[in-house]
Amino acid sequence: MKKIDVKILDQRIGTEFPLPTYATEGSAGLDLRALIDAPMTVEAGQTVLIPTGLSLYIADPTLAAVILPRSGLGHKHGIVLGNLVGLIDSDYQGPLMVSLWNRSTEPFKVEVGDRIAQLVFVPVVQAEFNVVSDFAQTERGEGGFGHSGKQ
């Protein structure tokens, strides 16, 4: 299994806050925590940037990382990512921030250390483009947006 070196900027991680871990052997994502100095309220409709205390430099161009919402926050509280998915390229070297959007009608309180998103590493395939006059025919052809049926 490939390992990636993740640098931790916030000295509270590992002392006041646990190191990020995978919850189970089959977990794809690591939980990202709100490393804020005091609790904060995200008002209805508001989007805020929240530091995670982590910095990341993947370096390997065959890998990237994505920041994804936590399903329970979105379903139960209307808390999702302001950019829907955060993409971390292999050559990015900065701190990880989470854009948190309260799409509900109620204020939402973020406590210091709350788990607010998850980080997943993914393989990268870069496309090479070739201009052609047509494609080989398939059974589906150009059909889209429900063309293959409902059931």
Swiss-Prot record:
Sites where the protein binds substrate: R70, S71, G72, N83, L87, I88, D89, M97
S-S bridge residues: none
Cofactor(s) required, per the database record: Mg(2+)
Pfam families reported for this sequence: dUTPase
Keyword set includes Lipid metabolism: no
Keyword Metal-binding: yes
Known function: This enzyme is involved in nucleotide metabolism: it produces dUMP, the immediate precursor of thymidine nucleotides and it decreases the intracellular concentration of dUTP so that uracil cannot be incorporated into DNA.
Record-given protein name: Deoxyuridine 5'-triphosphate nucleotidohydrolase
Source organism of this protein record: Pasteurella multocida (strain Pm70)
Classification of source organism: Bacteria, Pseudomonadati, Pseudomonadota, Gammaproteobacteria, Pasteurellales
Protein's gene: dut
